[in-house]
Swiss-Prot record:
List of residues binding ATP: G656, Q657, T658, G659, S660, G661, K662, T663
PANTHER family assigned to the protein according to its UniProt record, in alphabetical order: KINESIN-LIKE PROTEIN KIN-14M, KINESIN-LIKE PROTEIN KLP-3
Organism of derivation: Oryza sativa subsp. japonica
Biased composition (Polar residues): 1113-1124, 1151-1167
Keyword Coiled coil (UniProt): yes
Coiled-coil spans in chain: 271-333, 366-398, 432-489, 907-944
Gene: KIN14M
Protein name, UniProt field: Kinesin-like protein KIN-14M
Amino acid sequence: MSSAAADRRRAEAGTGSAAAAAAAAGEGDVGRFLAAAERMGLPGFSPSDLDTGPVSSVVTCLLALRDQFVSHDVGGLSCSLPEKVMMQSMEFPRKENDPGTQNSEGRRKIPKNPAMSEPSSPLSQTTLSSISRHAGHSFHDVFQLRQGRYSDLPSSKISEMMKSTSLDNAPTQSLLSVVNVILDELVETKIGEIPYHLACLLRKVILEIERRISTQAEHIRNQNNLMKAREEKYKSRIRVLEALASGTSDQTHVNSNATNGKAHVSPDHAVHQMKMEKDKTEDKKRLAEKDVVLLVKDKEEDVTRLTKDKEDMAKLLKDKEDIIRLMKEKEEMVWMMREKENMVSLNNGRVEDKHQLTDKDVANSAKYRNEIIKLMKEKEDSNDTIMKLNIELEAMKSSYEGTRILLDSKKKEVLQLLMDKESIEYIVSQLKQELAIERSSHQTHIQELETRAFQANNKLEQRIKEMELMLEDSKTRVRDLEELLESRSQIWEQKEIRLNQFIGLQIQNIQDLRLSSVSIRHEILHCQKRWSEEICDLGQSLKVLTNAAENYHATLEENRKLFNEVQELKGNIRVHCRIRPFLPGEDQTSTTIEYVGDNGELILANPAKRGKEGHKLFKFNKVLGPSASQDEVFKEIQPLIRSVLDGYNVCIFAYGQTGSGKTYTMTGPENATEKDWGVNYRALNDLFHISRSRRDTVMYKVSVQMIEIYNEQIHDLLGNSGSEKKLGILNASQPNGLAVPDATMHPVNSSSDVIELMRTGLENRSVGATALNERSSRSHSVVTMHIQGVDLKTGVTLRGALHLVDLAGSERVDRSAATGDRLKEAQHINKSLSALGDVIFSLSQKNAHVPYRNSKLTQVLQNSLGGNAKTLMFVQVNPDVSSYAETLSTLKFADRVSGVELGAAKANKEGKDIKEFKEQLSLLKDKIAKKDEEISRLQLQSHNTPRATAKRADSLLKHSSSSPGISSLGSKIQHRRTASGGRIKIVGSRAGSDVDNFSDISDRHSEAGSMQSVDDIQQSREIMGLSKLSMSEMGHNSVDPELPCFGYDDSEGRLSDISDSGLSMGAETDCSMSSVVELTSLPDQDRVSGTQKEQHMAPSTPKDRLHKVATRASRTTTPKTPQSPTLWPKLRDPPPPRSPISTSTGKVRVTQATSSSRNSSTQKRWT
């Protein structure tokens, strides 16, 4: 009995210790508050004043704290109110309890923490719920705005809302919605400054949210402590029950022995007594089971409550995180608005300074009245607070009395239980065995519950520690932000002061400048008037001299301008002379260059002669001295190179003796840097730069060729096989300049691509050492840039070509000491340069015949020297005395070149009509190929014996019609019918040349090609006349009987396609159509009559199409120059009538031209 009482006393002591711990926690909070108030310099109070009174010192401290926060808010509201609200929202939270938790604790009748903020008067549950509902409704009535904004509310309404208790009783979600609405209004209105009353309301709402979060955290800690106390209490009760069970089992054993001893005395009485004991035992068992059920139920309720508290805590933490995130977002937006506001405030600062003095007295009087009203309101608030505290004190006293009465009743119950123990021991002894059986199960269940509770406690403790660490971190960040804000505010204040001073000085300076400008303006007007009078007098006195000087200079300038215009219209070859500087080891004291003028004059002095006879004067477009840099050389020719992008053909070549610096001028030194680049690299770089600048209007495509002429053979320097591959030259009257179809064409997109290709070509170029130059160029190199531009707006196509020619130097064999291969190379070089001199002489004499075909070099330069191109020649001169003869020869050659008139160059433009015309021609070419394939297939089907002969005839037709690069001169194709079988026999004479002898044919016909100026319209008319004649002849005669499906339509289509191919070749090929076609047929009348019907029914679509194309070509491409004869014979005379003999034998002979007419036309063309 004594042990059970001791256990109960220990359980009550544990419960009391839990209450004491909660009270101690509350005292610890009060102590921290007093320490913080003392650091802030606020009046303090004693912790006992909260319990015993008086509370006046407490009210004084709270009022002082409020005044200090209000003063801080008023002072910093205009500049950084959002930051203050953010920092105040992150302050250390005060510990209060949540109303929902208070209600749940009231139901469990657990002693409350004295630090809780709710009233402790004994109110019923219904009363509390009605108050809560009323508070929620009042909050919605106050904060729910139907129309308008929070910023439009008056200050009195905001003050009423803040003083009411609706904030304390409002749901947390409603408070969050209020914060979001206020911030959204600020963002939508873009107001940088928050009104003071609205800021106070926002601050109070945020503080209320933080108070609830901190209250919930404190409540969870208190619940943990209470759970520990309850666990100790339950354990003590279990121990008491176990002790009671053990004592009852012993007593039951004793009673059973006594009962056995007395059984013989009174059986009925024993039975009755056993029934009574059994009933008592059952009652005790039910009570014990009830106690166990209550313990389990209490345990489950505690676990449920802890789970609910944990969920509430998580929800509150999530709400706080949302608030912090929203505040950060709003803070960034308000920061941007504040920056704008600062700019506005700077402009409005001057106006506010003016009104500040007048409004100061009014503000002081209003301030005094506001302070009086404020003090009166604070007095009323203090009285209300005192009344509330008194009510709370009375409530605490009444609760204390109730607790004491409850304690007395508990003591009585304990005594009653002790008295009842003796009577229960006998009954408990009977239940010992049953309890022993159930003990294991209950103990297992209790252990599980204890394990769960321990795990839950560990999790909660770990979470609390994490929250404490986060809270410390938040405090640290708040302090850092406060320091940063303070430093920045000081910096901005200093900047504002300096800016105001600067603005004041600038205003003063502007005023001074205005006054000065007015005075200066008057002085300038006066001076202008005086000067105008003086100038008029001076002009009259110097009129004669001025007129004479102006006439002289104007005449001189006009003569120069007219001379340049005449040179441009004549198309003379521009000649620039560059003098090579002396090399190391040469005698620099003696030179052959006597004088270099600024206008292109150069005097060459003969060291062997004195006086005027030893001096020769030359005049060129420009003379560049030895000190001229590569950049200066390029700037002289830069406008000429840029005309390539406008559709002109430009050729620049360097001429001079070996070792005079031609390769240095055109390419630059080996491994040259950008500063030492030659004309080639600089020109290409400039072209790409301009094309990129015009890419919005014109789209350019650039491709590069690089060849060399070595020993009268053309080699591709950019091909895979290096310089071993030999190439042929086509007619040089192409729109793009050079026409070397087998040379590799590389498309390029940047100057770096071209530089890489040129380096490859220079590595493949033939270079050798001679006595005059260690790296002497042994071949003529030609770099050609083909540029095609399309105007994105008009669709006009521009085609230009830039030819950069580096000629090999002329040399004397006795000086260069060339032998073997070098001697052979020198001979070819001198021969080609001699041929170039002959061409220049013929052009200067304006001879009708120019010997372009004498050398491959002149064939390459044919388009530049005698075609539609702007041409410039660099003459490289060696100033050494020993090279006087070569220098004189070079300058004489350059003088002859400068007198060559090429005619004005024209841009290569193609309109949309020409483009469509070429597309139609390409379609006609495709049709030719299809017809040829069909002919070959039909011939293979119909001719079995003469298969090879028919195949050869078909290939000749295909070659002459579709190959644009091979000419077949004077070919004769005769179709004869044999007497026995009617088979086709084809006899071809002077067939077209193949690819192997391609270069030889180019040599034979280069001269004829150079004089070719026949327009495409004349050729198309002759071709159409030929096709009409052929078709008319074939319409009256029978066709081949072995070609049943090749009727009028096919024959007309084939001839029209062949004529189209001749039209499409234009200036590229010289096809001879002087041939005799003899068509024979078998005497098969049925097939002939059927074929004639098909001829009458055949459509004339190809003929009409060809006529339409020819008509369009005549409108677009008719030149103004007189037409010259061509290799095509004119077919204006009708063919001779057929004889009866030819009719009877079925043989038809169509004579297109005689050999005499062909020879006469060819002779006219070459001359």
